[in-house]
A protein has these predicted regions:
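Flexible loop/turn segments at secondary-structure boundaries
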Residues: 36-37, 45, 93, 102-105, ...
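Short acidic (Asp/Glu) and glycine-rich catalytic loops that position anionic groups and cofactors
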Residues: 19-20, 88-92, 141-145, 161
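Hydrophobic alpha-helix feature that most strongly marks membrane-spanning transmembrane helices
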Residues: 45, 49, 90, 96, ...
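Non-transmembrane accessory domains of multi-pass membrane transporters/channels
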Residues: 51-104
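Generic amphipathic alpha-helical segments used as scaffolds and interaction surfaces in large
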Residues: 10, 24-31, 79-82, 96-100, ...
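Membrane-embedded alpha-helical bundles of multi-pass integral membrane proteins
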Residues: 1-68
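Iron-sulfur-cluster electron-transfer modules
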Residues: 74, 82, 107-110, 114-186
């Protein structure tokens, strides 16, 4: 091959490489490869407070709602966590309730919330429990944090469950089995 042919071939290969690279970058948000930027973003913005910490409710008498009962109450950080899920199932495989045959599946909770978010269900009137997440699965969680430890995106599943349980307990008076008796005996 002559020098001119090699230079032309190099140019064509270089242009083809550029076009393929740009097509890949454009396809990232619509494919599984989106985890390349969603997971690091979720890890960067993870909360620095201890896991399982129940936050004090300031001005409790003036609060309109407690916890999260509607999708519109989730903040940007919660929605980022839903979007960062790579659907690997590690959270479910280490969940002691799931392993014992209980109703809790952390992966399904996050995926159902992610699905609602992607469908545009950000309306404040949509009730999460029992429409999106079952009450039994929320109340079955032991808040051990094994799911968060195993999650490659560091999604704070326990915090999400705690927020929804707070709404069940403080707004609707629904507790896990045995808790109501304990509270009555105090």
């Amino acid at each position: 091959m002559s020098k001119e042919q090699l230079e032309a071939q190099h140019l064509y290969i270089w242009i083809l490489h550029g076009v393929i690279s740009l097509m890949f970058v454009a396809a990232i948000p619509m494919t599984y490869f989106a985890h390349m930027y969603k997971s690091p973003t979720s890890i960067y913005w993870q909360r620095t407070k201890p896991r399982g910490l129940v936050e004090k409710i300031d001005n409790i008498e003036e609060q309109e709602s407690f916890g999260i009962s509607k999708f519109g109450q989730f903040n940007w950080h919660d929605r980022l966590n839903f979007d960062a899920c790579v659907e690997c199932g590690r959270c479910t495989s280490v969940c002691p309730v799931n392993r014992a045959g209980g109703p809790l599946d952390p992966r399904e909770i996050i995926l159902s919330l992610k699905k609602r978010m992607m469908e545009g269900y950000t309306k404040t009137e949509e009730v999460l429990v029992p429409d999106v997440v079952s009450k039994e699965s929320l109340l079955a969680c032991t808040t051990c944090g094994a799911c968060v430890e195993q999650c490659p995106s560091r999604i704070e599943i326990v915090t999400t469950i705690q927020q929804m349980r707070c709404s069940l307990a403080l707004e609707e008076g629904q507790f896990a089995e045995g808790v109501a008796k304990t509270l009555q005996n105090i």
